[in-house]
């Protein structure tokens, strides 16, 4: 009997200690200080990493108020968290707890074998939520990041507060012939240890900023170099995974209680304007939650980071946009 009591007592001590440890970790997270802005020169060094249950180590940047509402900024194809670096400080200074992950195969995250579909990315993202202790968040995605956010919203609706789709289209694989053409012309011919040419990278990241942006040249040079050094395996897995991605069967299961904002540039030649009406129908988006920026291309958050962030913040706060005509102020 005494032995049983002793065992029970030890068990209770372990449970209590475990609970105290978790509470301590939460308190430490809430008390830590995070940057409100990060320079382009310091961006890469500001990355942390976490091991995920999906088997990869994911790199990420963390900013803002640790006690604030969690907001995830997700980058596009062959990019990394730097993609949102020009806009991230607006969200951090507005009081959000901002996370900017590097998707698998990109940035400083692992690049395992196998094609990376949007389901793969969404599953990684859920594992990131679990690893970081995030229950629910606002998700903002650009291009491939928006495809990931769409997929995540349809697979894990209980973890989505609101979502923002920037430069997006319905995810139906070969629908985007631009990707298939670029892969055939520039990625497939590469040697196993080769990298895309400077000319291709210049075209891939062709951007005409519409705002005065500090250190934009440094930003763009880093974006190009960080994508160009990716292995052929990574480029192949990213491209072919995207071309193979098709979530058409998931769209009927969209949870209508999750508000969706759609932002698009009128000059976007990658995620074409002809698909915007259909995208809005799939996610029940009305005129108060859609804006097309006149004269802006695919990389909205590169070209007009302040306007992009300001419009997203206004929508998050009020459920509507300050203007919907797309005219740049």
Identify the residue ranges that each predicted region occupies.
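Alpha/beta-hydrolase fold catalytic core
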Residues: 9, 20-69, 93-96, 135, ...
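Active-site loop/oxyanion-hole signature of alpha/beta-hydrolase fold enzymes
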Residues: 53, 100-140, 144
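Conserved HGGG/HGGXW glycine-rich cap/lid loop of the alpha/beta-hydrolase fold
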Residues: 56-108
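Short glycine-enriched nucleophile-adjacent loop
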Residues: 146-157, 163
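Flexible "cap/lid" loop of the alpha/beta hydrolase fold
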Residues: 154, 163-193
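Conserved alpha/beta-hydrolase catalytic His-Asp/Glu region
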Residues: 174-181, 194-254
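Conserved loop-alpha-helix segment in the C-terminal half of the alpha/beta-hydrolase fold
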Residues: 254, 260-296
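Catalytic histidine-centered segment of alpha/beta-hydrolase-like enzymes
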Residues: 296-305, 309
């Amino acid at each position: 009997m005494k032995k049983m009591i002793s065992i029970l007592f030890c068990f209770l001590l372990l449970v209590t200690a475990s609970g105290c440890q978790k509470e301590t970790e939460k308190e430490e997270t809430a008390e830590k200080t995070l940057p409100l802005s990060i320079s382009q020169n310091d961006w890469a060094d500001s990355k942390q990493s976490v091991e995920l249950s999906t088997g990869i180590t994911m790199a990420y940047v963390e900013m803002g108020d640790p006690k604030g509402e969690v907001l995830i900024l997700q980058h596009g194809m062959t990019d990394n968290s730097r993609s949102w670096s020009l806009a991230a400080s607006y969200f951090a200074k507005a009081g959000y707890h901002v996370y900017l992950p590097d998707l698998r195969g990109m940035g400083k995250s692992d690049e395992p074998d196998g094609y990376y579909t949007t389901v793969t990315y969404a599953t990684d993202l859920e594992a990131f939520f679990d690893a970081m202790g995030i229950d629910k968040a606002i998700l903002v995605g650009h291009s491939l990041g928006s495809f990931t956010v769409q997929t995540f919203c349809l697979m894990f609706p209980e973890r989505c507060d609101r979502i923002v789709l920037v430069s997006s289209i319905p995810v139906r694989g070969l629908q985007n012939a631009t990707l298939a053409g670029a892969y055939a012309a520039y990625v497939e011919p590469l040697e196993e240890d080769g990298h895309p040419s400077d000319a291709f990278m210049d075209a891939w990241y062709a951007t005409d900023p519409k705002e005065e942006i500090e250190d934009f040249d440094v930003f763009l040079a880093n974006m190009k170099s960080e994508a160009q050094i990716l292995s052929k395996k990574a480029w192949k897995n990213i491209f072919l995974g995207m071309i193979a991605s098709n979530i058409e069967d998931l769209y009927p299961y969209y949870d209508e209680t999750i508000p969706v904002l759609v932002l698009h540039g009128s000059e976007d030649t990658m995620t074409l304007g002809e698909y915007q009406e259909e995208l809005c129908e799939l996610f029940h988006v009305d005129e108060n939650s859609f804006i097309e920026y006149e004269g802006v291309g695919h990389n909205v958050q590169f070209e007009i980071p302040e306007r992009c962030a300001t419009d997203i913040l206004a929508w998050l706060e009020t459920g509507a946009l300050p203007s919907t005509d797309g005219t740049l102020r």
